[in-house]
Amino acid sequence: MTRPAARTRRQALNELLGLVGLLMGGGLLAAQGSQTLAARPVAGAANPPAARPSRDPATQAPARRDAIGTLDRNLITAASAGDQALVSRLLAAGASARAADEHGRSALLAAVQNRRTEVARTLMLAGADVNLKDADANSPFLLAAATGQADMVRLALTHGADLSSTDRYHGTALIVASQQGHVEVVKLLLKAGIAVDHVNDLGWTALLEAVILGDGSARYEDTVQLLLDAGADANLADREGVTPTRHARQRGYKTMVKMLMRVRGH
């Protein structure tokens, strides 16, 4: 490489980093704080059971990492802001789509947290890991399911999403999606072949979560029907021996009770 060419490349990189600095200085980029799956509502209990370590340590990010480079940190910030052009330029300049900060937060997780679907697509195409977890056991795939981002879940499924991956409560993507009544996400996950009767650390299946933590509205009725159609066990009870049918009856969810009784739920 000639000296003028090397100087031109350095100038281009300096301009790129300068642009990032201006954006950050102007307060345009999203803060790194974000929602997680850590706070899960637990019916009838003031304090949920302590979380167990993730079952898939290969994709579990440690609580702290060695300091990441400026390009990688700027990539996370740009992904949070949804700046597609800047994300592409940072990747071209050498930023890693797989890097994570000291909290285990990757650029892809930041994109999912801020609903930046196109940025997430770019990062996945660049090799971002959809199963990489942060210190709270949130992964891009699990968070997309929990927040009802069907397009994001669809992308993750085509880029190696692990259907057996679990959150801090050992809940699968199907469980967290059912808890929130995210019908389209539930459809996608069931079609992909996710286990329908997986039991989390609270002793609940996706069906139990939809009944116990839902509000009995149409979207939860649809969720329950989808789970039953996929073969969910209507008589798989919680730790106290209470079945989904009994939970639905106690809450006055008449339509759900009928659905469950049609498959011999009791």
What are these regions (language model features)?
Residues 3-20:
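N-terminal secretory signal peptides and thylakoid transit peptides that target proteins
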Residues 234-265:
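Leucine-rich solenoid repeat scaffolds
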Residues 83-91, 116-124, 149-157, 182-190, ...:
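Ankyrin repeat structural motif
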Residues 77-82, 110-116, 143-149, 176-182, ...:
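Ankyrin repeat A-helix N-terminal signature
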